[in-house]
């Protein structure tokens, strides 16, 4: 990744950074909840972004 990024690329990276987090604890505690973990979690070394 270049040090000088275009604004579009930077926006995409920021979005992916926000998406890449675990499920909040209060979501797990909801009644009748089946969500245990974030299935779309991405590791920076294992799976690369198609940018």
UniProtKB/Swiss-Prot annotation:
GO terms for biological process: cytoplasmic translation. The lineage of its organism: Eukaryota, Metazoa, Ecdysozoa, Arthropoda, Hexapoda. It holds the Pfam family Ribosomal_L39. The keyword Ribonucleoprotein applies. Keywords: Ribonucleoprotein, Ribosomal protein. One of its GO terms (molecular function) is structural constituent of ribosome. The keyword Ribosomal protein applies. Signal peptide: none annotated. This is Large ribosomal subunit protein eL39. Belongs to the eukaryotic ribosomal protein eL39 family.
């Amino acid at each position: 990744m270049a040090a000088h990024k275009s604004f579009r690329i930077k926006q995409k990276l920021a979005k992916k950074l926000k998406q890449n987090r675990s499920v909040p604890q209060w979501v797990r505690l909801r009644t009748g909840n089946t969500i245990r973990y974030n299935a779309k979690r991405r590791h920076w070394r294992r799976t690369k972004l198609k940018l």
